[in-house]
Amino acid sequence: LDRNGLRPARYYVTTDDRVIMASEVGVVNENAENIRAKGRLEPGKMLLIDTEEQRIISDEEIKQRVATELPYDEWVKEHVIHLSEITQADESDIPKVDDLFKKQQAFGYTQEDLVRMIVPMAKDGKDPVGAMGADAPLAILSDKPQLLYSYFKQMFAQVTNPPIDSIREEMVTSTRVMLGNSGNLTDPNKAGTYALSMRTPILTNQELASIKALDCRRMKSVTLPILFDPTKGADGLRDALNELCEKAEEAARTEQNVLILSDRGVDENHAPIPALLAVAAVHNHLIRKVLRTEIGLILESGEPREVHHFCTLIGYGVTAINPYLALETVRDLQARKRLGDITPEQAEKNYIKAAVGGIMKVMSKMGISTVRSYHGAQIFEALGLNTNFINKFFVNTPTRIGGIGLVGVANEALARYDRAFKSDESVLEPGGWYGPVKDGEEHLFNPKTIDLLQESLINGDYAKYKEYSKAIRNDYHVTLRSLMELNYPVGGGIPIEEVEPEESIVKRFKAGAMSYGAISKEAHETIAIAMNRLGSTSNSGEGGEDVARFKPLPNGDSMNSEVKQIASGRFGVTANYLIHAKELQIKCAQGAKPGEGGQLPGKKVYPETGKARHSTPGVELVSPPPHHDIYSIEDLAE
């Protein structure tokens, strides 16, 4: 059974030596007097039916037999080194970052990165939470240079493979990683068991310096630069990648068992290879050469700084990451009193804690509970990268719409390099991905469109509303759908008398599920009234509804949502709530952040919101990623 115990496995042993196993009791009818023994598998346990010996072999016996075949215990004691036990490097051995601002520019840091991401992570030790729609451009549609990570979207699990609750099920998760030669499971021997055990995949500068200094018990590292000549453009990037892969292959064929990819040498003459591209190129090249398990992979880079960056890097093959520039930025922010009353060491510790917690949350979206299982899994989809580029560097990653290739990636890297070393800019770019800012990313909902919408509502001006809808549709091409047009037939459409009338069509419309609390009381009620007038249906979302809305208004309008949603937090779900629905909707994934559950910040839980949700006002409300009583298709059917 899986380590989480999510897949039930119950069994009977009958008096005539039959074994009946199923996910539920009663799948096969059997008289009670015929049952000699019964039981269920516990998380991580095994059951083996030996048809030759005519008996069931228990979990303990199976594992005891395997564990004693070879001296694994001795091998582990002799050949596994724990990072916490090795001699720590001196402060003088840790490289310093010269000209922090220039390096931040070269790696595409923005003011938003500092304020919205790094400060909360270093101050609070948590991955920051936001509450708004994503109306910024896809990476391929942005007019700003994009980091390569932005072209990859995380995949997630639903009913057949439920996500894990990384908070409530933390006991079954593990962030520990093993660095070095992975050995050969089909031919186990001592030579292949040397490894360095690390508590998390995020390394401090001191920890990496200690690993670099390690040259004992067959743990040796080699550092390769991930830099290219900016004067040669895309050709320079291509040549640098080819040389990198050749040197990585050479290292894997020698006695080195730790390969460190480093971009610390960035300067006026050297631009950084995008870290994700370097990692994926080396990882897949070594796989093609059947050498990947011969060597561990560490990234020493100034580029990654947020959770999605770390996840893509681990997913495409890196074992551990030293985000040296992010850590240096944390210390700089602390020195400038931007993090409150905490020490530099505590700020760095908080940042790493937030990063690791975020990695666990993303892994849990796929039902994966250990970093070692997520490592190299490539559970992403590319959006805006062409097939040739993907097939060479990101093998087997889905990419459906095409897009840029190595030349485009090189141009974006060079744009960041030029800003750092060929301009006299004195401030970081604003960013603006999380909200509209001057000279930042475009947004569908920006001052112009919001002003048009508000003016149309305040004045009841339909012409203004049409201006607003036209601006949303035509002026800001930030989504794929905004690029599409209907191909109307030449000579006009279908005669109006041959098509279904509007009144009939709208009855099949359903409003999106937005909870009361996520949107205001007025908006939630207005949507319900409008949909009921049309004969369509509105959806309550997961936040319950005030019982007063279940009764019609004096003018005949109804504020009752005919579709009632049941989410994993069960907020507002009562018998009265359920009986006033025409349709019940069990929400298995959050549309805005699938696999993560729901989260309503405490500041949005007003007294009326708390009343509808049967919760305490001002207290943050979290719906766990899975329903804790729905872990299979069978559970959902029940």
Question: What residues fall within each predicted segment?
Answer:
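Conserved helix-loop functional segments at active or binding sites
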Residues: 230-233, 246-258, 264-267, 284-291, ...
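Active-site-adjacent beta->alpha loops and helix N-cap segments on the catalytic face
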Residues: 268-281, 332, 336, 630-633
